[in-house]
């Protein structure tokens, strides 16, 4: 059996495919960035004004330097947005998405003041877990890879060496015993399930083995003739349709945290030694309660690891399992990249401080757990990278921001500037107004904008102020909503879409109206209390907020203030500097600024239409006993029927089974949308459409 041997990496060129060509400042920025990277500059800053196409510039830069790239972003929503943009620009290359797979995560903690221990509680998103596996799989099997990741990529991940050692290579014509392969799959943490075939499982029928790797949506079929692999194929797990024949494939483990029996037994011995050492320390300090607590918890974990190979909170023993020395850095996604990878930090003024803060935030919680006997000291080695450890693991770095921070500007030799927008749009005019009568003035400005079918953003300092202002504007007949951290994530996406569509005209917010919001319909951004110095009214925050009006031809920013603070002056001066450059460029080249037209395509709207069509179709389907529609489709047996559809393909599926499948996929579709996995939801929607077409054909033929 061929295991952790040489992996034949696919080497394909990065190629941007787009109807657009670099325009405005982009050609000069791409050339300058490429020259700096090729000359070996370690830190490069791209100061790119909002809306100048920094993402596209990055894609063209990757095409020029032809190196695997990690793009670090400040949050999941922007990561998804950026990954989609790169997938459109680099359709023939692997663009991966790597974020935390927790939908919900409550870390374990101990509050000494109230003697309260909080158990770890979490919920894992399976689709995000698949995408994480897809990212590591791509990094190990090809070079043309762009991974868009949040800061969670500096948290511990299993070692690449163990991950590769656990891999199995399937090669057509190779000698391999079927039973040995099945045992190997089990050791890789895949589960055999002949009835419910899904990601992370395999099934066996005679000499045919099928598996859906953790990182794939397609299944792999391996056909044996004796002890020889006769055929390898990829197929659609739902329909059974063969996608293509394969000569060679790699199957990686179902978990990044794979440890063989030898490694696990070594780890258990090390944990036992540390426990004995720590108990001695606690007892010498007369901390008998803490010693007893630690003995009970650790002994239980050790028994679970010996019997099951796993225990809750096993990540706290990761340094022992990895065989790392005390205090050494954990392995993480960065270790899966080749040595020459390029790092791009998006919105660096926010993301760089995030990276630096991760370690201390994690340590403050863990110290309490160790001091009070809930964890061994080695639990503190299950952590994100420290800032200096992060720097050791990265090579050349490009920082992207409209407002670069002092750190990146201090590291770089000057900066590359991208001020001109391809559309010719210029930065908005900034007007400072007195706070006296600011709400009445705001109301008048809103009415002027709504008459022109334009939208308004209003930014306040507190949630209370946002809600009170929303109530006041509603009372004066304004169509308005508010947006702050208490509004759930999916609702935020819906609010932004509804604002663009004109469902309402004004959106009131606090700190969410900054990086990454792309709203071409917004012609006015009003900043209340602009002279209140602080994080929300720093020069960086003000420039970012001003940028929200930079996508509209008639964009304006109104700052309500009784004095001009240093932050306001810096923001206004920088905006005026950029305006002057943009106006001069447009005049010289005879460019008339064009409105930015961006399609309002939102999956939530498409799902609503799909639901209406599904209800209309299934409403005509009789289940007996008066049950019609999608509720009937959820009756007992629907899932079993759905599994049968998967196994036998559509042609063999009776109408009732198809209906069950439609209902099940509809539920999955909404689940994916709720997790902001819009691409997944769209793919499931397409499957639902195909199944409904099949059902309609059966009805037309009189078979349903």
Curated annotation (Swiss-Prot):
Residues 438-604 form the Helicase C-terminal domain. The keyword DNA repair applies. A motif (Beta-hairpin) lies at residues 101-124. Disulfide bonds: none annotated. InterPro entries: Helicase/UvrB_N (IPR006935), Helicase_ATP-bd (IPR014001), Helicase_C-like (IPR001650), P-loop_NTPase (IPR027417), UVR_dom (IPR001943), UVR_dom_sf (IPR036876), UvrB (IPR004807), UvrB_inter (IPR041471). One of its GO terms (biological process) is nucleotide-excision repair. Residues 659-694 form the UVR domain. Residues 35-188 form the Helicase ATP-binding domain. SMART domains: DEXDc (SM00487), HELICc (SM00490). NCBIfam families: PRK05298.1 (NF003673), uvrb (TIGR00631). The UvrABC repair system catalyzes the recognition and processing of DNA lesions. A damage recognition complex composed of 2 UvrA and 2 UvrB subunits scans DNA for abnormalities. Upon binding of the UvrA(2)B(2) complex to a putative damaged site, the DNA wraps around one UvrB monomer. DNA wrap is dependent on ATP binding by UvrB and probably causes local melting of the DNA helix, facilitating insertion of UvrB beta-hairpin between the DNA strands. Then UvrB probes one DNA strand for the presence of a lesion. HAMAP family: UvrB. The beta-hairpin motif is involved in DNA binding. Belongs to the UvrB family. This is UvrABC system protein B. It comes from Pseudarthrobacter chlorophenolicus (strain ATCC 700700 / DSM 12829 / CIP 107037 / JCM 12360 / KCTC 9906 / NCIMB 13794 / A6).
């Amino acid at each position: 059996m061929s295991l952790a041997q040489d992996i034949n990496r696919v080497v394909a060129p990065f190629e941007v495919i787009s109807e657009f060509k670099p325009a405005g400042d982009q050609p000069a920025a791409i050339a300058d960035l490429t020259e700096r990277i090729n000359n070996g500059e370690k830190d490069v800053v791209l100061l790119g004004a909002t809306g100048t196409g920094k993402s596209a510039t990055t894609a063209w830069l990757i095409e020029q330097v032809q190196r695997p790239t990690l793009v670090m972003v400040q949050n999941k929503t922007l990561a998804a947005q950026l990954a989609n943009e790169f997938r459109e620009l680099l359709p023939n290359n692997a663009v991966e998405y790597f974020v935390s797979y927790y939908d919900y995560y409550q870390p374990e903690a101990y509050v000494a003041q109230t003697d309260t221990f909080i158990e770890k509680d979490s919920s894992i998103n399976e689709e995000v877990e698949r995408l994480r596996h897809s990212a590591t799989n791509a990094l190990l099997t090809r070079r043309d890879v762009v991974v868009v990741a949040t800061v969670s990529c500096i948290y511990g991940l299993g070692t690449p060496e163990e991950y590769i050692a656990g891999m199995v290579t399937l090669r057509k014509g190779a000698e391999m015993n079927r039973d040995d392969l099945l045992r190997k799959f089990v050791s890789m943490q895949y589960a055999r399930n002949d009835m419910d075939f899904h990601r992370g499982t395999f099934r066996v029928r005679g000499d045919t083995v099928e598996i859906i790797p953790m990182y794939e949506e397609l299944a792999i079929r391996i056909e044996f003739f004796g002890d020889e692999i006769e055929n390898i194929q990829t197929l659609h797990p739902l329909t059974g349709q063969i996608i293509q024949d394969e000569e060679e494939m790699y199957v990686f483990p179902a978990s990044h945290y794979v440890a063989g029996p030898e490694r696990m037994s070594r780890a258990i011995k090390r944990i036992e030694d540390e426990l004995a050492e720590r108990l001695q320390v606690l007892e010498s300090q007369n901390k008998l309660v803490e010693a007893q607590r630690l003995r009970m918890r650790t002994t239980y974990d050790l028994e679970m690891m010996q019997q099951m190979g796993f225990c809750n909170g096993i990540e706290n023993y990761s340094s022992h399992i990895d065989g790392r020395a005390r205090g050494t850095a954990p392995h993480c996604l960065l270790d899966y990249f080749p040595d020459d990878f390029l790092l791009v930090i998006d919105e660096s003024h926010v993301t760089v401080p995030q990276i630096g803060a991760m370690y201390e935030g994690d340590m403050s919680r863990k110290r309490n757990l160790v001091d009070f006997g809930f964890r061994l000291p080695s639990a503190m080695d299950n952590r994100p990278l420290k800032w200096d450890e992060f720097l050791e693991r990265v090579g050349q770095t490009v920082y992207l921001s409209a407002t670069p921070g002092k750190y990146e500007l201090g590291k770089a030799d000057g900066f590359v500037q991208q001020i001109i927008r391809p559309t010719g749009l210029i930065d908005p005019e900034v007007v400072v107004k007195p706070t006296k009568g600011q709400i009445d003035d705001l109301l008048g400005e809103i009415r002027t904008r709504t008459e022109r079918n334009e939208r308004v953003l209003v930014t306040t300092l507190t949630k209370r102020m946002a809600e009170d202002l929303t109530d006041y504007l509603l009372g004066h007949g304004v169509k308005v909503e508010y947006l702050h951290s208490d509004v759930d994530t999916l609702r935020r996406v819906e609010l932004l879409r509804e604002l663009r569509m004109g469902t309402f005209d004004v959106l009131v917010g606090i700190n969410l109206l900054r990086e990454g919001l792309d709203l071409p319909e917004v012609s006015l951004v009003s900043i209340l209390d602009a002279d209140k110095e602080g994080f929300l009214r720093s020069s960086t925050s003000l420039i970012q907020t001003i940028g929200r009006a930079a996508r509209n031809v008639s964009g304006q920013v109104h700052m309500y203030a009784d004095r001009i603070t240093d932050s306001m002056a810096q923001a206004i001066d920088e905006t005026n500097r950029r305006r002057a450059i943009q106006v001069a460029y447009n005049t010289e080249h005879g460019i008339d600024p064009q409105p930015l037209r961006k399609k309002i395509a939102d999956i939530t709207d498409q799902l609503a239409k799909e639901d209406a069509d599904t209800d209309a179709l299934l409403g005509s389907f009789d289940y007996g006993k008066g049950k019609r529609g999608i509720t009937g489709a959820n009756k007992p047996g629907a899932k079993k029927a759905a599994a049968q559809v998967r196994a036998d393909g559509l042609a063999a599926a009776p109408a009732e089974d198809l209906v069950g499948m439609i209902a099940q996929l509809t539920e999955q579709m909404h689940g994916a949308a709720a997790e902001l996995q819009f691409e997944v939801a769209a793919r499931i929607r397409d499957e639902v459409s195909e199944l409904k077409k099949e059902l309609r054909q059966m009805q037309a033929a009189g078979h349903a």
